Swiss-Prot record:
Name of the protein described by the UniProt record: UPF0178 protein SO_2894
CDD domains noted in UniProt: PIN_YqxD-like (cd18720)
HAMAP family: UPF0178
Record-stated family: Belongs to the UPF0178 family.
Taxon lineage: Bacteria, Pseudomonadati, Pseudomonadota, Gammaproteobacteria, Alteromonadales
Taxonomic superkingdom: Bacteria
One Pfam entry name: DUF188
Amino acid sequence: MANYKIWVDADACPNPIKEILFRAAERKALPLVLVANQMLRIPLSPFISQIRVGSGFDVADQYIVDHVAENHLVITADIPLAALVIEKGALALNPRGELYTTDNIRQKLTMRDFMEDLRSSGVHTGGPDALSAADKQNFANSLDKWLARVK
């Protein structure tokens, strides 16, 4: 399992998703690293650690990009970060259970840029829905599929 690791873009990661990740790291004895610009509450575990980075735009993202490797999994809702880690041979999973891949990341980036253009022109696009029980279950299922492959 030494070649596998889970990275978390932790500043924006919902707490219920972190709890799922904590349990998975313990169950599988898999390294889990949460990267954030603030201290987080994490369980005492030899498998779970946190990296506190300085404040600033995309500082945590850059840390993850600099340290991620092939076969790692990154938990993030940040589509540009997902694109960067995919380029390095890692996988990216969002907190709703959607896996970003080489097959779908370009489309996701295009849609993100389009929505950003709409917002900057004054169109109100709204934010994402609150994390639902179905989202949590989808995330847990997607994580379990990845964990089954790394065993």
